[in-house]
């Protein structure tokens, strides 16, 4: 048996300001820090063997705050891709084997919003028209100017899920993934076999853990974790 936890980052400063964020590296708001700490307390008894995150600071910071509250897991250590960083990142000593590795990847980044990034959503409607902005936000295949559609996001997140995250889970490792609304939406669409209409209705709340469990029968959704237990409703 193994647990797989998905966590959208806590509220960012631009979430609070209703601004298209995408790949802009915006930090958490004070409310987002609080959300991440609450998530950490809810997950305090989960012993995570491996962590995955996007490369954006709001997701990484959420992971760090969660793991600070976690009582069962080891300290985290980012595993780097480059040869030099791997060498410089080596930790020597008896405690080095006890770190929980963190793998960060751009494939888990938020949907790239192109020319919408940095625009207040109401201002974007004034510039491009509310119908086009609605279409870009709520269609599966239509992308904003110079940006990604949700389908484009799916086509980079799901291969990463298959190549790295799911194999780790099948080895019996407990995994946490901190990412973003649209990158997680596309991953969950794959796991839940949602069609293009269903995935557009899927809303991923900030800072609320979504827990899956893998056993001999396969991967099963337990639901969103809260103080009372699990809420299994997805859409």
UniProtKB/Swiss-Prot annotation:
State its role. Answer: Catalyzes the interconversion of 2-phosphoglycerate and 3-phosphoglycerate.
Task: Say which family it is in.
Answer: Belongs to the phosphoglycerate mutase family. BPG-dependent PGAM subfamily.
Show the catalytic activity.
(2R)-2-phosphoglycerate = (2R)-3-phosphoglycerate
Transmembrane helix as a keyword of this entry, yes or no, is no
DNA repair in keyword set = no
UniProt EC number = 5.4.2.11
Q: List the disulfide bonds.
A: none
Active site residues of this protein: 9 (tele-phosphohistidine intermediate), 110 (proton donor/acceptor)
Positions marked as site (Transition state stabilizer): 180
Mind listing the GO biological process terms from this record? gluconeogenesis; glycolytic process
- What Gene Ontology molecular function terms does this protein carry? phosphoglycerate mutase activity
What HAMAP family has UniProt attached to this entry? PGAM_GpmA
Gene of origin?
gpmA
UniProt-listed CDD domains: HP_PGM_like (cd07067)
Q: Which organism is it from?
A: Methanococcus vannielii (strain ATCC 35089 / DSM 1224 / JCM 13029 / OCM 148 / SB)
The record, for NCBIfam families, names:
pgm_1 (TIGR01258)
> What UniProt keywords apply to this chain's record, in alphabetical order?
Gluconeogenesis, Glycolysis, Isomerase
Pathway the protein takes part in:
Carbohydrate degradation; glycolysis; pyruvate from D-glyceraldehyde 3-phosphate: step 3/5
The protein's name: 2,3-bisphosphoglycerate-dependent phosphoglycerate mutase
């Amino acid at each position: 048996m193994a647990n797989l936890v998905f966590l959208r980052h806590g509220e960012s400063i631009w979430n609070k300001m209703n601004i298209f964020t995408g790949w802009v590296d915006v930090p958490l708001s004070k409310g987002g820090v609080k959300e991440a700490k609450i998530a950490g307390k809810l997950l305090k008894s989960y012993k995570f063997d491996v962590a995955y995150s996007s490369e954006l600071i709001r997701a990484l910071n959420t992971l760090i705050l969660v793991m600070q509250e976690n009582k069962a897991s080891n300290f985290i250590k980012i595993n780097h891709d480059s040869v030099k960083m791997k060498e410089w990142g080596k930790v020597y000593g008896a405690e080095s084997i006890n770190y929980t590795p963190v793998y960060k990847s751009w494939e888990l980044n938020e949907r790239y919003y192109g020319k919408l990034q940095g625009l207040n959503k109401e201002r974007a409607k004034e510039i491009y028209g509310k119908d086009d902005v609605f279409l870009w936000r709520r269609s599966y295949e239509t992308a904003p100017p110079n940006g990604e559609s949700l389908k484009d996001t799916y086509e980079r997140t799901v291969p990463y899920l298959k190549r790295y995250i799911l194999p780790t889970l099948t080895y019996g490792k407990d995994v946490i993934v901190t990412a973003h609304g649209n990158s997680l939406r596309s991953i969950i669409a794959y796991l839940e076999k949602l069609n293009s209409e269903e995935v557009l209705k899927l809303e991923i709340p900030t800072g609320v853990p979504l827990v899956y469990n893998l056993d001999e029968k396969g991967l099963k959704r337990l639901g969103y974790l809260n103080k009372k237990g699990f809420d299994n409703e997805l859409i």
